[in-house]
Amino acid sequence: MRFLTFLLLAALPFGVAAQKKSDPVWPSFNIDSKTELISYNEVPEVSGATASELYDRTMKWGSDYYKNFGEKVRKQDKEAGEIEIFARFPIYAYDKKGVKTASQQGLIQYTLTILFKDGRYKLEITKLNHKEVSYQPLELWLDKADPDAVNHAFYLTDIDAEMKTVISSLKAALADSGDAGGDDW
């Protein structure tokens, strides 16, 4: 009987440790001081490229990157050097173990604005919101005291990864002059 009691007490910490949930990982976001919205901002330099060339490269990138790019372009002004893109992508639910499922939880919408000057461009992603039955700004999901905070942390991590993918893809496309370096016929 003593042995059984000892065995039970020895196994108890393992059962308790197995029930512990790890804290969710929250991505760090840049919050614009004026608008108080989540934003991604960069001003990369592209030496030797004119504003017009950067504009053309962006239009090519957009048609390659987005499905139905023409529907996503809200503003395109080559003379002023500005393109505004309104895009969206789906987010998916996570189960209790933190594994992504195939169940769609709505769409995330964002506005990508790109301004061009000779040798550089400014990209800004802002106005991120969750579209389901109604629109919900993602800034509400930053509340770690929210009852659904664990799911919000998963969603925000996915959203941050998607935004960084958009930015890196755009930067790679604009840095590439498109010259194949082949024979000039």
Regions found by a protein language model. Give the residues of each.
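Bacterial Sec-dependent N-terminal signal peptides
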Residues: 1-21
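Ser/Thr-rich, low-complexity intrinsically disordered terminal regions
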Residues: 19-185
